[in-house]
């Protein structure tokens, strides 16, 4: 918004206003703005959620026993705070004429709406059964398919239907008409992967922040022909503005972590986890680094695989591979304390983020 106002009404002779033309300046401002919004709205919103929800998020009876004692009464739907900060900051600092920004914003909002409906039904019914799996996946598939097709229409023709591989600078796999389906699987998959990971205080939000930092840099590089050519990346004009979105996501995530750090004052709920995962998937599709997201977001991938393996093996043999799935609950059952699990998973995410950055140079 500010960028568009200055572009159309600002004076080229005012040096300070020229700062708004730089993505790096607006990205930094977006991060700080989102952080400020989160910190300012956090306490009032949490107080309001406590008044409305009273008993807090329903706790799964089959989950770790201590969750019933320690987490009962904690309000959920904290994802509303993340989305408010993310959208407010992005709309303020991003170039709103950029199609990629709108495609990612609306995909994020759509996943957030599905998560909000799921949280609302869980609270109103006072159990952990929200929107039916079929309805939930149907809505996610529809939103991600539209988002994927939208972003495909914005891409250069020589990239639009192709899949790029990390470490390989030249080779592209042509997907043809299947690309929107691939985008749908990527976005929906990561939406649910973050949802699976969000089971302990602070566990999901820090890996999301790390992924947003990495993809903020990637979007800046692939959106700039000079940097893309130097690093031998596939340039995607227009995606540089997603750096502003990613920076806003970092700020919103840090602000939420202020209240979600153990012991959490609020949970993000499906409102937050689905929207954040959907956002990461959409950004990866836009910048043609979907497989790099599997590296950077490897923690989310492993958590999801633990659920798939557990369900498949139990249905096949009647036995469990893990003490409990997702994986973080397995370690809880083994006797690890929650802070140890969370911090060690954060360390893994940092290492995976660095590995993702390494793919930009090792080509």
UniProtKB/Swiss-Prot annotation:
UniProt gene name: mraY
Main location: membrane
Superkingdom assignment: Bacteria
Protein's cellular compartments: Cell inner membrane
Membrane topology: Multi-pass membrane protein
Matches recorded under PROSITE patterns: MRAY_1, MRAY_2
Cited NCBIfam families: mraY
UniProt-listed InterPro entries: Glycosyl_transferase_4, PNAcMuramoyl-5peptid_Trfase, PNAcMuramoyl-5peptid_Trfase_CS
Enzyme category, top tier: transferase
Example of a GO cellular component annotation carried by this entry: plasma membrane
Cofactor dependency: Mg(2+)
EC number: 2.7.8.13
Key words of the record: Cell cycle, Cell division, Cell inner membrane, Cell membrane, Cell shape, Cell wall biogenesis/degradation, Magnesium, Membrane, Metal-binding, Peptidoglycan synthesis, Transferase, Transmembrane, Transmembrane helix
Functional summary from the UniProt entry: Catalyzes the initial step of the lipid cycle reactions in the biosynthesis of the cell wall peptidoglycan: transfers peptidoglycan precursor phospho-MurNAc-pentapeptide from UDP-MurNAc-pentapeptide onto the lipid carrier undecaprenyl phosphate, yielding undecaprenyl-pyrophosphoryl-MurNAc-pentapeptide, known as lipid I.
GO biological process: cell division; cell wall organization; peptidoglycan biosynthetic process; regulation of cell shape
Bilayer-spanning residue ranges: 27-47, 76-96, 97-117, 137-157, 171-191, 202-222, 226-246, 248-268, 271-291, 292-312, 340-360
Annotated pathway: Cell wall biogenesis; peptidoglycan biosynthesis
HAMAP family: MraY
Record's catalysed reaction(s): UDP-N-acetyl-alpha-D-muramoyl-L-alanyl-gamma-D-glutamyl-meso-2,6-diaminopimeloyl-D-alanyl-D-alanine + di-trans,octa-cis-undecaprenyl phosphate = di-trans,octa-cis-undecaprenyl diphospho-N-acetyl-alpha-D-muramoyl-L-alanyl-D-glutamyl-meso-2,6-diaminopimeloyl-D-alanyl-D-alanine + UMP
Name this polypeptide is given: Phospho-N-acetylmuramoyl-pentapeptide-transferase
Any one GO molecular-function label of the UniProt entry: phospho-N-acetylmuramoyl-pentapeptide-transferase activity
Family designation: Belongs to the glycosyltransferase 4 family. MraY subfamily.
